[in-house]
Regions:
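ABC family nucleotide-binding domain
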Residues: 1-209, 213-216
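Conserved beta-strand-loop-alpha-helix hinge in the C-terminal portion
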Residues: 220-241
C-alpha cells in the first residue's frame, strides 16, 4: 500500500549540512498499524512530513497506492493530501466555536467537497470513531480523548487510506491514550474499509501494542522491539563485557 525506497533528506549546506534521512526503505501494508520510534531529533517527524506531502525529499521515491511522489514541493501534491493522507497530531487543532460535526465537515469543504456531501461524510466518520451521540457538541463539552477522536474522524473522513499520527496520545491521560490506540486498531482491522496507520510515539506501551515496530536511528529504519528502541540491548552488552 505504501512503499518507500532510498529516501534521503538533508538540511543546511557545506560543513553545516546535516544528513537526517540516509536512505529510508519502508513498507506499510493495507490494514497495518506500525509504530515508529527513535531518539529525539532523529528525523521521525521529517519522515512523516515527506510521506504526507508537506516536505520534499532530496532523493528516493514514495509509492502510495498508484501515486508516485517524494521529490516535489507541497504545491505539487495537493491531491495527495486531499485524497490519500490524513494527519493526527498531539494537539487536536479543533475550532472551539464549531460542533464536532462542523469541525470535520469544514475540513472536507475546504478540500472541495460540497456542503451536503461533507456533512454526510463527517457524520459517517464520527460514527466510525464512536461519537455518533456527540456530533453536535463543541470541543469544550468533550473530554480530551473525545476531542482526539474528532481529530481522527477529520483525518479519515473521505476514506483516506493512510493516516499519519505524530505523538497522537501526547496530550492525553493513560486511559484516553489506550482508547485511542484501540480505535487505531479497530480502524486498521475494519472488515470493509481498513486503513493503514504509521504512528510516531515515544510511549513504549503504545508502540509494543502496534502490529509492528520500526526504529529510526542514524538516518535509517530497521525492525525493532522495545529493548533496542530504548538502547537497553547496548547497555546489556556493555555489562557483559
Amino acid at each position: 500500500m505504501l512503499k518507500i525506497d532510498g529516501l534521503t533528506k538533508s538540511f543546511g549546506s557545506g560543513s553545516d549540512k546535516l544528513h537526517v534521512l540516509k536512505g529510508i526503505d519502508l513498507e506499510l501494508n493495507r490494514g497495518e498499524l506500525v509504530a515508529l520510534m527513535g531518539p529525539s531529533g532523529c528525523g521521525k517527524s521529517t519522515l512523516l512530513n515527506i510521506i504526507g506531502g508537506l516536505l520534499p525529499a532530496d532523493g528516493g521515491e514514495i509509492k502510495l497506492q498508484k501515486r508516485t511522489y517524494g521529490l516535489k514541493g507541497p504545491s505539487s501534491v495537493v491531491d495527495l493530501r486531499r485524497d490519500l493522507v490524513g494527519w493526527i497530531f498531539q494537539d487536536f487543532h479543533l475550532l472551539n466555536n464549531l460542533s464536532a460535526l462542523d469541525n470535520v465537515a469544514m475540513a472536507l469543504e475546504l478540500s472541495g467537497t460540497n456542503s451536503t456531501e461533507a456533512e454526510q461524510l463527517a457524520a459517517e466518520a464520527l460514527t466510525k470513531v464512536g461519537l455518533e451521540d456527540r456530533m453536535h457538541h463543541i470541543p469544550d463539552q468533550l473530554s480530551g480523548g473525545q476531542q482526539q477522536r474528532v481529530a481522527i474522524a477529520r483525518a479519515i473522513a473521505g476514506n483516506r487510506p493512510l493516516l499519519l499520527a505524530d505523538e497522537p496520545t501526547g496530550n492525553l491521560d493513560i486511559a484516553s491514550g489506550k482508547e485511542v490506540l484501540q480505535l487505531f486498531k479497530d480502524l486498521c482491522h475494519d472488515d470493509e474499509k481498513p486503513i493503514s496507520i504509521l504512528m510516531v510515539t515515544h510511549d513504549p506501551e503504545l508502540a509494543s501494542s502496534a502490529d509492528r515496530m520500526l526504529l529510526l536511528r542514524d538516518g535509517k529504519t530497521e525492525a525493532s522491539d522495545i529493548r533496542s528502541a530504548w538502547g537497553l540491548d547496548k547497555e546489556q552488552d556493555g555489562e557483559e563485557e
